[in-house]
Each structure stands twice: as structure tokens, then as C-alpha cells.
Regions:
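Hydrophobic ligand-binding cavity/cleft-lining segments
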Residues: 1-40, 46, 154-155
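Hydrophobic pocket/interface hotspot
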Residues: 17-21, 27, 51, 68, ...
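Secondary-structure transition/hinge residues
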Residues: 25, 29, 59, 137-144
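Hydrophobic-ligand binding "helix-grip"
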Residues: 43, 54-103, 107-110, 142
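Short coil-to-beta transition motif at edge beta-strands of beta-rich domains
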Residues: 45-51
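A conserved amphipathic terminal alpha-helix motif
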Residues: 107-155
């Protein structure tokens, strides 16, 4: 199993950030490996909603079916599966005075054969985690509008 965690502060209110990130199709905007991510069911986003995510990792194309397993006002969990892996994206949110603190944890569990490569892949997943921590705040800003100026930023 590989686990990567990043903590980010986003310059938008918690409810807006959760609303944006609850639609897993938006991973196209912030996950560096995602090529496409399409909703496979319809209706409002709620527990049980599903997305087909196609991504490229180390030159290999892979497809996972993700399901929204938890949808709380301050906690989202998406679980993606295919024949060789289970991927869990766990997003916890905390109000930070009108801003949002996001604790993002990605966990990948490989099947038998792929499990042997886990130690070799850890560094690559850490690199992807770094990219997510750069891209996700920009995607949120783009989707929700430019972040408002704070006291420590020039106007």
C-alpha cells in the first residue's frame, strides 16, 4: 500500500470548496494523471455516485471506476477500483476563518502481482502528490473565481 498526504489552505469558503471537489469529474482540472473523468450515473452528487476515470501513470493508461463512499459537509471519500488496484481519495476540510484547510490523502492498494512494485512506485506517487498540491488550489481558484485579496497581499 502507498499513502500520500498533502495539506493545503484554499482561499475560499469550506462549503464552496466541498461543492467543487465533490464532483469527481473535476479531477481533470487538478489531478496530473487524469486524462478523462466522466460521471456514469445521473442525478445529484451523493453517496453512491460513480465516475469512470482514465489516467496515465508512468506511460500506462489505466481505468478505474470511482464511487463516492462518504459525503459529509467536511469529509469526502472516493474509492476507485479496477482488476489490479484500489485507490482511495480521502478529503477532509476544516474552516480556516473564511478559508478552507484541506487534508488530502491518497491511498493505493495493489493486487498481488503489482504489490511487488510498491516500494519502487512510492517516490513517483510522492511526486504526483506534490503536483496535486500545486494544481488543486489553482483549479479551485479558477472554478470558484480568483481568490479574494487577503491583508498580507498587495491590492
Amino acid at each position: 500500500m502507498i499513502e500520500v498526504e498533502r495539506v493545503m489552505t484554499l482561499d475560499h469558503p469550506l462549503t464552496d470548496v466541498v461543492g467543487f471537489l465533490s464532483d469527481f469529474a473535476n479531477t481533470e482540472m487538478w489531478d496530473p494523471g487524469t486524462v478523462t473523468c466522466d460521471r456514469v450515473d445521473s442525478g445529484p452528487v451523493s453517496v453512491g455516485a460513480e465516475w469512470r476515470n482514465v489516467s496515465v501513470f508512468r506511460g500506462h493508461r489505466t481505468e478505474l471506476l470511482y464511487r463516492l463512499a462518504r459525503f459529509d459537509p467536511d469529509h469526502l471519500i472516493f474509492v476507485g477500483r479496477n482488476k489490479t488496484a484500489t485507490s482511495t481519495d480521502d478529503l477532509r476540510f476544516e474552516d480556516a476563518g473564511g478559508r478552507t484547510r484541506l487534508i488530502y490523502r491518497a491511498r493505493i492498494e495493489f493486487g498481488r502481482l503489482a504489490r511487488l512494485a510498491t516500494p519502487l512506485l512510492k517516490r513517483e506517487f510522492e511526486r504526483l502528490g506534490d503536483e496535486v498540491s500545486e494544481r488543486l488550489p489553482r483549479a479551485v481558484d479558477h472554478a470558484l473565481g480568483t481568490s479574494p485579496p487577503r491583508g498580507d497581499q498587495p491590492l
